[in-house]
Amino acid sequence: MQKIFNFFPLSIYKSSISLTDSEKKTMIDDIYEMEKNSKNVKYKTKTNSWTGDTQGFEFLHNNSNFDKLFKEIYKDIIEYLDNLDINHSKLNIFFQRSWATISRNGEKIASHRHSQSHISFAYYLKKNDKDSKLIFFDENKNNEIIPNLFDSPSVAIDGIIKKRGFLNAPIMTFPTEENDLVIFPSKTLHGTEKNMNDGERISISADIVLLAKDSKNLEHLSPSIDEWKLFSN
């Protein structure tokens, strides 16, 4: 009997966090105020979403109005690590940066990765069913037996790929709803489709760093920040 075996997956974690309308409104109003007080206005273009980390608001985890949300997210981060069979009791887990994004008609978040961290997430604070989707890009293309076979427009037009699926897709669109939380490795290339409606999507993202509590005999993993020393003159 013939069988296909699939190895080396990218595992994306999705959960849902329920907050009261009042709690969500407080955060949304806070985010609008941040947008109004943007520190880097020229960076924002007509086709790109507003991103708080580029506008001087990259530490939402230190804002008391977001405390409950980040406590709930922490629980899901632990669940995510459990699903990967990672012993998080040996790790110190830090929210490094966290920010809001606002996407309106004609705007998107360009493809990017978070190279400075280990785990990233997106929480959808405000979203409707017609909003653009999250996209993940496959950079490894382990099944691509011919270079550019999976992402060549001419190959697609010619019908050489009969059907797109998990075995041959260069990108995956990932549907989400309001209140959804999506967790993934920071190194994963991702972005969003262009928003094509008059709605408004507000999401919260963050970068998470994991350090070894005890680095004795470890070749890899960064040691506890308590052991670091700041350069000084």
Regions found by a protein language model. Name each.
Residues 3, 110-111, 193-197:
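Short proline/glycine-enriched turn/loop segments at secondary-structure junctions
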Residues 1-87, 108, 197-233:
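Non-heme Fe(II)/2-oxoglutarate
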Residues 125, 188, 208-210:
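Short beta-strand segments enriched in hydrophobic/aromatic residues
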Residues 103-181, 200, 214-219:
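Catalytic core of non-heme Fe(II) oxygenases with the double-stranded beta-helix
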